[in-house]
Amino acid sequence: MFFAVITLFPEMFEAITAYGISGRAAKRDIVQVTCINPRDFAEGNYRRVDERPFGGGPGMVMMAEPLAKAINHAKQLASQAGCVHVPVVYMSPQGKTLNEQAVQQFVDYDGLIVLCGRYEGVDERLIQHYVDQEWSIGDYVLSGGELPAMVLLDSIIRRLPNVMSDEQSAIQDSFVDGLLDCPQYTKPDQFEGLDVPEILKSGHHANIEKWRFLQRYQRTLERRPELIEKVALTKQQKKWLSDEQG
């Protein structure tokens, strides 16, 4: 999958390309992550990419022209890589909140061009002409779009085929089927007086599966009750709940 990131701080994305699951995916050429600095497309000796906002106010606004040139360059790179469906995504507090359903849709794209804002944001005309989607990672403000962009890339990359060493691990993550994940345990059997639930050591896979589902359901009910209404339970899961409640 192809990713082009428009950012004033390309070095930050070594966290994606050099470490962990996403780093291994990059080394195996499952993903291609290219960072494009809009300063390279700015004019003048100082390569300015920001100016004061019309109408006054604090801070600076990223200028449309260097960003547009950077996006067009990213589109050329995507085309050269054989990618057809490559939306331009702007990471913004005004965007829709990123969730697992959106991530799974991104996986079907050939790639993404991700625009990272800075300062007070970017010129609205750039958004109107070049941005296909705006996404947020939550109702809070960060110094720029780089960290949200890394969240987006990491969440997509780990969903791609052949990236995870254990595909089942990705399937069982929180939110994949609408429920939170179940409690996890590893050695030793006892830690500070707390024991691993005996059922997890029983070797009875059907009982373990049932226990994990019930734990996930109860945890979601307690911590994120608004998610329960959207969960599509299987026939077996409904039976487990009925047995437990009745």
UniProtKB/Swiss-Prot annotation:
Highest taxon in the source lineage: Bacteria
Subcellular location per the Swiss-Prot or TrEMBL entry: Cytoplasm
Broad class of where this protein is predominantly found: cytoplasm
Key words of the record: Cytoplasm, Methyltransferase, S-adenosyl-L-methionine, Transferase, tRNA processing
Catalytic activity line of the entry: guanosine(37) in tRNA + S-adenosyl-L-methionine = N(1)-methylguanosine(37) in tRNA + S-adenosyl-L-homocysteine + H(+)
Stored CDD domains: TrmD-like
GO molecular-function terms, A-Z: tRNA (guanine(37)-N1)-methyltransferase activity
UniProt EC number: 2.1.1.228
Record GO biological process: tRNA N1-guanine methylation
Annotated GO CC locations: cytosol
Positions bound to S-adenosyl-L-methionine: G117, I137, G138, D139, Y140, V141, L142
Family: Belongs to the RNA methyltransferase TrmD family.
Protein name listed in UniProt: tRNA (guanine-N(1)-)-methyltransferase
Upper taxonomic lineage: Bacteria, Pseudomonadati, Pseudomonadota, Gammaproteobacteria, Moraxellales
